[in-house]
Structure formats: C-alpha cells, structure tokens
C-alpha cells in the first residue's frame, strides 16, 4: 500500500483500523478540519492518539471502542469509549461536553465526520460518519472532518447487519482496533 499523501490544507490526518466480529476490515483515514473548527478537531485528534488522560492520568480514547449505532443510508456512530452503548461522553477538557464551535461546514456529502450530540452545546467524544448527504443535520451537528481514504471500509461497516442486540446496534462488534495520527 503506498504511503498516504498529506492534504494540501495542512490539516491533521488521523486513522482508524476497523474490525468486524474480530476480523480485520481495513483502515479509514480522516482529514480533520482544524482550519475551520480547531477545538472540535483537536478533541477528536487527542482521542485518536490517546493523548487525552482521565483525571487520574489514565489514557482515554477510541482504541478498542465500538461503533454502537449503524443506520444504512444515513450514518455509522461511535465514540462512546466510556459505556460502549451511546450513553457515555466526555471531552479532552475534563467535562462531559463542550459547546458547538460553529456550523460553517454542511452535511452535503457522504464521508463527513460530525459530532453526535444530545442537543445544542453537548459535544463530547461521540461522532458519526455520514454515508449519504444529510442536510437536515445542518446547524444541529458540527462537521469537523471527512474520510480522506477508506470510504470502502465505511460502506462495508454500513452494510453490517443490525437488530439482534438492539434496533440500530450491529449484530457483530464493529471495533476501532487501532487508531492514531499520520
């Protein structure tokens, strides 16, 4: 596999190595839009690298966490490394959530990385990857990145059967087995 070329924007690149049911699926590389939403991008980047620490100094982040919600023709949601079921959230500043940075970027294409939230100003560790344009999410969820390489992996995740363990929960664990910065 040839080395990943960095984006001309100078924005950071991070990656997820994904497994389904314990079997390697592939790598997704994301460009984080630090130039537009620096705070939101940095929150995600630190959870990818493991730089973020709990109050007692333990690393915390996405490595080993699951995508707990997958809806075909919509999105794949993950980032709850606290509880694994969509109920947990935190941010790198030691709070449960932080404010919406801005809504400059729109949900106008597949492969966008956006903050999952429970309403205005409730961003934390949870995120989703769009699989189609989702303009109805504009001005409600902060777009902070996009798939740079590996949309084929996202589409395979999207095709994972759901429903056995909960309506939108994958039947097989979809796990971020490794993650970091390029």
Curated annotation (Swiss-Prot):
Q: Which InterPro entries match?
A: Cyclophilin-like_dom_sf, Cyclophilin-type_PPIase, Cyclophilin-type_PPIase_CS, Cyclophilin-type_PPIase_dom
Any Pfam family from its record, for instance, is Pro_isomerase
Show the SUPFAM superfamilies listed in the entry.
Cyclophilin-like
Please name the top-level EC class of this enzyme. Answer: isomerase
Catalytic activity reported: [protein]-peptidylproline (omega=180) = [protein]-peptidylproline (omega=0)
A Gene Ontology BP annotation from the UniProt entry: protein folding
Q: Name one GO molecular function term.
A: peptidyl-prolyl cis-trans isomerase activity
Can you supply one Gene Ontology CC term for this chain's record?
A: cytoplasm
Q: Which Gene3D superfamilies match?
A: Cyclophilin-like
- Give the EC number(s) listed in the UniProt record: 5.2.1.8
Report the locations given in the UniProt record: Nucleus
Which residue range or ranges hold the PPIase cyclophilin-type domain?
15-181
Per UniProt, the keywords (alphabetical) are: Isomerase, Nucleus, Rotamase
Biological role: PPIases accelerate the folding of proteins. It catalyzes the cis-trans isomerization of proline imidic peptide bonds in oligopeptides.
What PANTHER family does the record point to? PEPTIDYL-PROLYL CIS-TRANS ISOMERASE, PEPTIDYL-PROLYL CIS-TRANS ISOMERASE D-RELATED
Q: Which family does it belong to?
A: Belongs to the cyclophilin-type PPIase family. PPIase H subfamily.
Task: List the protein's name.
Answer: Peptidyl-prolyl cis-trans isomerase H
Its source organism is Gibberella zeae (strain ATCC MYA-4620 / CBS 123657 / FGSC 9075 / NRRL 31084 / PH-1) (Wheat head blight fungus)
């Amino acid at each position: 596999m040839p080395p990943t070329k960095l984006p001309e924007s100078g924005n950071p690149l991070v990656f997820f190595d994904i497994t389904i049911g314990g079997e390697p699926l592939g790598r997704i590389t994301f460009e984080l839009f630090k130039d537009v939403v620096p705070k939101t991008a940095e929150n995600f980047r630190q959870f990818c690298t493991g730089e973020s620490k709990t109050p007692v100094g333990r690393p915390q982040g996405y490595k080993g966490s699951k995508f707990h919600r997958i809806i075909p023709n919509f999105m794949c949601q993950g980032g709850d490394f606290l509880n694994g079921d969509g109920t947990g959230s935190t941010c790198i500043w030691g709070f449960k959530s932080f404010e919406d940075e801005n809504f400059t970027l729109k949900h106008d294409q597949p492969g966008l990385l956006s903050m999952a939230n429970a309403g205005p100003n409730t961003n934390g560790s949870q995120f989703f990857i769009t699989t189609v344009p989702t303009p109805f999410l504009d001005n409600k969820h902060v777009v902070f990145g996009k798939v740079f390489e590996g949309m084929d992996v996202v589409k395979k995740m999207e095709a994972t059967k759901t429903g056995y363990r909960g309506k939108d929960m994958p039947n097989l664990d979809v796990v971020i087995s490794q993650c970091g910065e390029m």
